[in-house]
């Protein structure tokens, strides 16, 4: 008789794309991508039309708090790793940040495709852009909003 294994919880929060009565969960391929996207969502929700390019280096503490809330792990070390500008050979790189941003584009884009929605307002073109989705369309739990 097969034994029942407990369901492994990998995250305490999920992101859904919702249209009227239809919703699809966004499957983030990278944890850093999900947390980074939450930061962009919080920025857009709180600043509205005044949302602008984020200086990500200023978001280490928020990244850590969000990572802890979502995954139950302090994420400041993950942020530091993601933001490294140089590798062990002292060569310029930002592979971690690039990978996180690419995962956001890919993961949000594929969810929008499955829902037959244009991805434009929900994705980031590059590190210098901000989300175009209307702030009133962003619904985040109070405990996430309180961290900002």
Q: Model segments located where?
A:
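Intrinsically disordered, low-complexity protein-interaction/activation regions
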Residues: 1-148
């Amino acid at each position: 008789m097969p034994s029942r294994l407990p369901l492994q919880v990998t995250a305490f929060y999920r992101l859904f794309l919702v249209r009227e009565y239809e919703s699809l969960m966004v499957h983030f391929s990278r944890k850093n991508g999900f947390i980074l996207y939450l930061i962009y969502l919080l920025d857009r929700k709180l600043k509205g039309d005044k949302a602008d390019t984020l200086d990500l280096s200023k978001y280490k503490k928020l990244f850590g708090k969000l990572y802890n809330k979502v995954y139950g792990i302090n994420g400041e070390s993950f942020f530091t790793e993601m933001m490294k500008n140089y590798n062990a050979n002292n060569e310029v790189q930002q592979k971690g940040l690039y990978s996180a941003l690419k995962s956001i584009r890919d993961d949000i884009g594929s969810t929008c495709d499955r829902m037959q929605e244009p991805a434009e307002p929900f994705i980031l073109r590059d590190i210098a852009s901000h989300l175009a989705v209307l702030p009133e369309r962003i619904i985040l739990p109070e405990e996430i909003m309180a961290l900002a």
